[in-house]
């Protein structure tokens, strides 16, 4: 994990056989100091190649990096004192570039337009972000948005949530998962266009 919170480009091209060209990513956000739960969940998952922590708190990502033997990308969030417009990362995969940010600098609680515009201006095909504590996976015209929600401080009566993203050379898919699998609360999903400027969620 990079110690500097400025923008970095990560290249993750899997050196696997053509039949096994899959990148599985454990995506979490807004753990707010309660990282033990995220570590416990990771240990129950199979075939994870990469962890992405989308901020709040930065030290949680550092702790996970120290305790787990797996590549990890972390960004700083608003609770980490980061208000830098360059505080994002770009992950280059065989699917394409993925924009990685906490989301507060792109005002994702008001609209997804800013983060989509910024990501697309950097030639990214997807944006992973946190900040809202509301899980989301949506696609429009080949562009994807993923927010894993929050494991520690979910909102709207949801259980704590996280995501597992699967990246292939021609596709990106993701599953929003909950710590209590017997209760699956509502998840924001569907068309990005229908969600733009829909501030009633917050």
Question: Which stretches of residues belong to each language-model region?
Answer:
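Aromatic (phenylalanine/tyrosine) cluster motif
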Residues: 4, 10-12, 21
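Beta-strand-turn-beta hairpins that frame and shape the catalytic cleft
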Residues: 20-25, 90-99, 139-145, 167-173
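Helix-adjacent hinge/juxtasegments
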Residues: 73-78, 82-124
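Conserved beta-sheet core of the metallophosphoesterase superfamily
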Residues: 73, 108-171
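Catalytic metal-binding/acid-base residues of hydrolase active sites
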Residues: 32, 57-58, 79-80, 104-106, ...
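Core catalytic region of metal-dependent phosphoesterases/phosphodiesterases
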Residues: 8, 17, 24-93
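A short C-terminal boundary segment appended to hydrolase-like catalytic domains
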Residues: 126, 134-141, 171-202
């Amino acid at each position: 994990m990079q110690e500097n919170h400025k923008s970095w480009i990560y290249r993750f091209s899997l050196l696997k056989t053509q039949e096994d060209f899959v990148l599985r990513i454990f995506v979490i956000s807004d753990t707010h100091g309660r990282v033990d739960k995220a570590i416990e969940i990771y240990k129950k998952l199979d075939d994870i190649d990469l962890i992405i922590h989308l901020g709040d708190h930065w030290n949680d990502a550092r702790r996970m990096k120290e305790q787990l033997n797996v590549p990890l990308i972390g960004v700083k969030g608003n609770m980490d004192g980061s208000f830098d417009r360059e505080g994002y990362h770009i992950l280059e995969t065989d699917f394409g570039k993925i924009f990685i940010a906490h989301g507060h600098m792109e005002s994702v609680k008001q609209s997804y337009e800013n983060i989509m515009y910024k990501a697309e201006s950097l030639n990214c095909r997807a944006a992973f972000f946190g900040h809202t504590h509301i899980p989301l996976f949506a696609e429009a015209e080949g562009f994807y948005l993923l927010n894993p929600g929050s494991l520690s401080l979910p909102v709207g009566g949801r259980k704590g949530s996280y995501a597992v993203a699967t990246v292939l050379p021609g596709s990106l898919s993701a599953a929003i998962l909950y710590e209590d699998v017997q209760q699956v609360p509502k998840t924001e999903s569907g068309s990005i266009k229908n969600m733009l400027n829909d501030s009633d969620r917050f």
